[in-house]
Regions:
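C-terminal structural segment of proteins
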Residues: 1-167
Length: 167
């Protein structure tokens, strides 16, 4: 892994500000893909922006919409009573991801932002016609996923929440 700096901002605005100051900054959600990629020198960064202190975690229901914030861990999704009563298949999906260590650290936002073709969330987000909310816009799932490991996120754009219509 290359030498790099590390910050832990308290808000998404501060996280985006830190990103804009760096030449090769990367957001750190759960780190399940990013850290091994950096350690293997398949990617480099001059700054890791740890999102764990931001307030973008949790699950709510608003009318006929399930809202899952980006830093919600797989375990939190799997054990959420709101998810269980609205879209139980997402609980099942989240409860099958990796092992308990991955489920306790990995996040829905990191998984979707990475768009690994072997990941579970991207196909669920697409199939459920979710809306991906970022710090600057809302993107329909059909427009979000561009290709393998590719999304329509702009440079420095940060996923904050997923809004999923309850069937």
């Amino acid at each position: 892994m290359y030498d790099l700096n590390y910050v832990k901002p308290k808000s998404t605005n501060d996280a985006v500000s830190e990103y804009q100051k760096s030449s090769e900054g990367q957001y750190l959600a759960g780190g399940m893909t990013l850290i091994p990629t950096l350690k293997s020198r398949l990617s480099s960064s001059d700054l890791l922006i740890d999102l764990s202190e931001t307030s973008i975690s949790g699950v709510t229901i608003s009318g006929k919409t399930l809202n899952i914030k980006a830093m919600t861990t797989h375990s939190e999704v799997a054990n959420s009573s709101d998810v269980k009563k609205s879209i139980p298949s997402i609980c099942d999906l989240a409860g099958q991801i990796g092992d308990h260590m991955v489920r306790n650290r990995g996040t829905i936002g990191g998984s979707v932002a990475n768009n690994d073709p072997s990941a579970c969330y991207p196909s669920a987000i697409l199939g459920l016609n979710a809306t991906i909310k970022t710090n600057i816009r809302e993107i329909n799932a059909d427009d979000f996923f561009v290709g393998l490991f590719e999304t329509s996120l702009d440079e420095g754009e940060l996923i904050t929440e997923f809004s999923i219509p309850i069937p």
